[in-house]
Curated annotation (Swiss-Prot):
Span list, region Triple-helical region: 118-571
Residue segments, region Nonhelical region (NC1): 572-744
Annotated Low complexity bias: 168-190, 478-506, 540-556
Alphabetical list of PANTHER family matching this protein: COLLAGEN IV NC1 DOMAIN-CONTAINING PROTEIN (PTHR15427:SF33), EMILIN ELASTIN MICROFIBRIL INTERFACE-LOCATED PROTEIN ELASTIN MICROFIBRIL INTERFACER (PTHR15427)
Protein name, UniProt field: Collagen alpha-1(VIII) chain
Amino acid sequence: MAVPPGPPQLLQVLLTISLGSIRLIQAGAYYGIKPLPPQIPPQMPPQIPQYQPLGQQVPHMPLAKDGLTMGKEMPHAQYGKEYPHLPQYMKEVQPVPRMGKEAVPKKGKEIPLASLRGEQGPRGEPGPRGPPGPPGLPGQGIPGIKGKPGPQGYPGVGKPGMPGMPGKPGAMGMPGAKGEIGPKGEIGPMGIPGPQGPPGPHGLPGIGKPGGPGLPGQPGAKGDRGPKGPPGPPGLQGPKGEKGFGMPGLPGLKGPPGMHGPPGPVGLPGVGKPGVTGFPGPQGPLGKPGPPGEPGPQGPIGVPGVQGPPGLPGVGKPGQDGIPGQPGFPGGKGEQGLPGLPGPPGLPGVGKPGFPGPKGDRGIGGVPGALGPRGEKGPVGAPGMGGPPGEPGLPGIPGPMGPPGAIGFPGPKGEGGIVGPQGPPGPKGEPGLQGFPGKPGFLGEVGPPGIRGLPGPIGPKGEAGHKGLPGLPGVPGLLGPKGEPGIPGDQGLQGPPGIPGITGPSGPIGPPGIPGPKGEPGLPGPPGFPGVGKPGVAGLHGPPGKPGALGPQGQPGLPGPPGPPGPPGPPAVMPPTPAPQGEYLPDMGLGIDGVKTPHAYAAKKGKNGGPAYEMPAFTAELTAPFPPVGAPIKFDRLLYNGRQNYNPQTGIFTCEVPGVYYFAYHVHCKGGNVWVALFKNNEPVMYTYDEYKKGFLDQASGSAVLLLRPGDRVFLQMPSEQAAGLYAGQYVHSSFSGYLLYPM
């Protein structure tokens, strides 16, 4: 049976009940009941006619404390005789037609005007925006999955930083502990006699009668040399002497070393070429990390990072709308956000060098390095602690006679004493009375030359003398003015590569360098740490791998036991023995005079008993720096010495095979200028001079071709103490070489 449709009132009631029981769900979130703000009832103009439905008015049925809730925009339905205004999802409820017919009022029933519902008015303008509400509680989002580490970037390539400023000199350290008392010193040498004292005052004149003249006495013993007399008047110019013939005297013995002079003033800073770069030293141990440096200046703001994907929707119940509060205080600093993408490289920072860091711990002692070259002479050190008193020295030279004392009382006659040593001559007394003429004395020694007298008158021009022998080399003169630049010489041959220098001390740590440009993306990083997981199922055995690389050679094994003796071999056939290495054939071709070279110089025997024709040649090195002056330099380390013609004990080459020889020497200069000469039979044939520059090691060379006869001697020698800075060391060699070019 069909159910007839109910009246419109029943439909509205059912619709109201169904809507009141619905809970609004948006995006999976549940919204509870909220109190609605009071709404202004819609204004209904009375002139608009409305239909009056039949039946009784349906009173308002509240379903909650404050009315029906359909959302935030739901108006509140008041009690009254009118129908509630029910919005349906932002749409107004359309009047329900009655089967396509309009409602007709019944007879006898009046419809009050207040119950008539007018048409919906136009939508009003939006109201002003309310004040912002208080900040909500921070959401608690689920942290995202940790991303995989990115690939390792390429190592940046930056320019090396500028060298740091030299650090300030450190403060003077605490005085060291008192050293142990040194060994007792030896008795010192006899001191230098003191200066002669001033003459004493004249004695009081004696009181006595003059005696008669005595008999002439015997001639006295030879007196001591009298004091130096005053210079006499210039004598007349004597006749011109004959030409003298004298041999140069032997060089005197080297005197005792003088006292250390005060340190000289600091010289100007030298300007020289930098030395050859030494090999890098061994890598030191890893130092402890230094203290964190000061933060650098803030760089420019980087490019904002790419916006991340929206997070998962939060789960929570919406609270009730509160009354808009007053603007709150500024919120605290939020948590640090995720790091953005790296920005472009900033401008190079210009910062001051930081303060020197604290002194680090003392590192592990390194391997002792090779012996360095001899350093320059240091300043005179502070006087040391006084040693224990030494033994009494030898009696010194008697000093000069002191001034006479006052006349004392006559004492008792003493016993005869031991005859003392002869005293020094007393001061010159006043002239006495004229004595009798004595006998002529013995001829005295020649006195010292007097002070140079006044120049005498210019004498007549003498005859031209014979040409004298060349004199000894004089003391080098002062440095002359700088000469004009000479003509550039031909380019010399390239010398042999030098020996690598000793590794210098490490310089101070410089300030941090300017950051280099951004490097290219690096290669994939090393594999991460092994994860912690359950062991998987054992896989199948794979194919055998390729054979590995050949390992390092093992240590040689112990020698095995000797084997049994072998069978005797066949008889040997001795081939003719060639000349040993370093020997030359006797027939050396024509000499300078066109005659075949003689064979009389093959007196030595070779290794196999035959004659050995060894070339006269040698090269010797100097092992100790600063050899003595005025004597042949002893190059005592031999590299080669054919026929043993060079003597390393004396430093002299003695010719045995006459001929034309070539000699060369290479010396180093350090600590002072150097002046060397090549001598042939005590006559210098070539000089070489080099000026020393402080802080640099210089070199000088020389060579000569000499014609030698048997017995001629050739050697090197330094003629002056003022230029004796010849240096040699473990890795700095001074050498002397010579060899026969062609025999005579």
